[in-house]
């Protein structure tokens, strides 16, 4: 799996700027006000062939005992515990501060590898900037500039040297590999135990975190399967925002290794933003998806109707997925859930013949033509499959850039129905044929061809022959003179 790198440091040393550099995004807010990043943001990046996750923490104020800064410090310590490597960021302009020393004392107690990065080092003497930070006893300081990128590549390259090359993606396995994902304490491990029929995973009635996801191989009706459980062996502890946030990283890691994701929701709790975030990542990754609404037996009929309304409102983008209302503890609804997992896997790995895809496309266009965009009406000619997991359909034609989102949804539903693609995202790509008359004014004009009569061609050919004969005679004369001397 991808290693997770946590960015640690006191407020306003440039963690969010470095985060943006490492992920090539602007997901974390960047401002000169200390403490602006009050929770952890997470993203992923890649150096060469090695991918990684990165967490941008809030500023670490270790001397504060209460209030929001104290909560930020708790989240930071949680990130250190869960990360595979820590980048401790200090400010090269401000220099070494007492807060830096306190944070360094905490980090030296951590079993995680810590890399000291002296930020805002652009334009300065590296040796001078790094000198005073040797006092922190965290190894060789790396002088970098998060804003300009100086030294960042070499820092991350050194961190990733200690992690093995990524293995081949299990998502391409020849059997279903499904990840059980969701927020803490929604019943993921209980569901895994119910599917396996034995208590292979320790589960407590208390939310916690895990160092590693657990891969469990098993057979069902003679067929091989692999479950990736993101709950794992839990630590007893208070459920706080840090635990909630870090569950996203675990879900992201598991989803990338799976070809089906099982999203577990808690019927006794409201649908949270965290649920939508995890579901959205599975959708973005193109994974087949099944949703298990757990603890269904413990709520009233009125509450059940409310949960269904919340799901349709907050998780509307999962209209392709099959929803199951289950009780993992009492093992109710598990058989139907497993049937949907198998069906979603089959749909994600489907191979669709090109003639049938094209026929479905033509029928859809005959039934409802794409609307005009100004004077242009898109013309669709044929389609073929462009990939699996998720299935991709490539449509060829003219002026396809004018296709509206609503018409793409219409085509998606048409293809989904024709090929029974329940439980998997379906992506449609448009391959636009180049129009030779488009932007004709901007293209260099070719010289017009002149018509040449047959008599003119003969005259030119005879002229070339005469010229060639004269050249041969001159050459013979010059050669004779040369050897006669």
Swiss-Prot record:
Signal peptide: none annotated. SMART domains: AAA. Pfam families: KH_dom-like, MMR_HSR1. GO terms for molecular function: ATP hydrolysis activity; GTP binding; ribosome binding. Residues 350-434 form the KH-like domain. It comes from the Bacteria. Disruption phenotype: Essential. Keywords: GTP-binding, Nucleotide-binding, Repeat, Ribosome biogenesis. GTP 1 binds at residues 9-16, 56-60, 119-122. GTPase that plays an essential role in the late steps of ribosome biogenesis. NCBIfam families: GTPase_EngA (TIGR03594), small_GTP (TIGR00231). PANTHER family: GTPASE DER. Belongs to the TRAFAC class TrmE-Era-EngA-EngB-Septin-like GTPase superfamily. EngA (Der) GTPase family. This is GTPase Der.
